[in-house]
Amino acid sequence: MQAMFHLLPDAPKPVAPYSHAVEAGGFVFVTGQLATDPADDSLPVPDGIEAQTRKVLDNLRRVLTGCGLAFDHVVCVRIFLTDFKRDYAAMNAIYATYFAADRRPARTTVGVTQLARDGIVEIDLIAVRP
């Protein structure tokens, strides 16, 4: 099986040795995104779970678009929250606006102790190539 590695100019610059996405076996595995600004990754992440969730999902959209995909192609999502109890409901409200009600992917959400760049939410996903 061959793999295709995607480094995309419109997505936030990687801060470690990874690809934005790797395509293999008809699936596209998208690296976890934080609420960083793709135009200037030196800027701090926005305050609050709503703003961070929007920015993370917008960054994921950039990666998907760069791979010729959209949220309708997503089949699995993993979400990491630094304060699960405080942020879960608000994150869900924003998250739900990015996926059609009849095309919501499988999902796992977990609480973690810390994320890079003092982020409070990180999301990665798997999409399928139609």
Task: Indicate where each model-derived feature is located.
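N-terminal presequence-like segments and the immediate start of the first folded domain
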Residues: 1-58, 62-75, 81-130
